[in-house]
Amino acid sequence: MTTTAFAFVLAAYLIGSLSFAVIVSKAMGMADPRSYGSGNPGATNVLRTGKKLAAALTLLGDGAKGWVAVALASWLGPRYGLGEQGIALCALAVLFGHMWPVFFGFKGGKGVATAVGILFGINPWLALAALATWLFMAFVVKISSLSAIVACVLAPVYAFFILGPHSVYFGTCIIIAIVVVHRHKSNLIKLMTGQEDKIGNKGDAG
């Protein structure tokens, strides 16, 4: 890895390490989202407080940082010799930063909103396809975690058709899907045992 690529990847990781669930909650005088509910610093868990604005700001912040990291790498990177592989690494770095943030004790979220932001940075149509899948599943089954898992699993399929099997971002989407689904392992166990709560109820989908 070149020094330039390392700098961009490190910057992406640091951007990802900005946990908006914690930042927004602290700014609004709320408890640390890691101390209640599922313990997950994400929009769903913040919503459990009943503070819809805080949850919305968390969702937007987590999604925006995924887009910003990829967009900056895409716009500025080529000027310094950063190719698509380097941009793909930045996409993964911002996601890993969200999940294991250096600024917050490496205890981060599950990455759904950030993953969507990353997809928007890669290709808006790809992101819209994944987002539409989540919305459709949420409407049908009304389970946030299952909707997120299905959307993540199908994202590489959409990438295959939209970007092509030889695109470096196709591989990136596969890695994102694997990591995000793995972060939902506790939700998968609850889904298999019929204990996962539906949207609007208290649970661990955040």
Curated annotation (Swiss-Prot):
Identification of the protein by name: Glycerol-3-phosphate acyltransferase
Cross-referenced HAMAP family: PlsY (MF_01043)
Annotated PANTHER family: GLYCEROL-3-PHOSPHATE ACYLTRANSFERASE-RELATED, INNER MEMBRANE PROTEIN YGIH
Organism: Chromobacterium violaceum (strain ATCC 12472 / DSM 30191 / JCM 1249 / CCUG 213 / NBRC 12614 / NCIMB 9131 / NCTC 9757 / MK)
Pathway the protein contributes to: Lipid metabolism; phospholipid metabolism
Subcellular localization: Cell inner membrane
The reaction(s) this protein catalyses: an acyl phosphate + sn-glycerol 3-phosphate = a 1-acyl-sn-glycero-3-phosphate + phosphate
Quaternary structure and interacting proteins, as annotated: Probably interacts with PlsX.
Enzyme kind, highest EC tier: transferase
InterPro entries: G3P_acylTferase_PlsY
Family recorded in the similarity comment: Belongs to the PlsY family.
One record GO biological process: phospholipid biosynthetic process
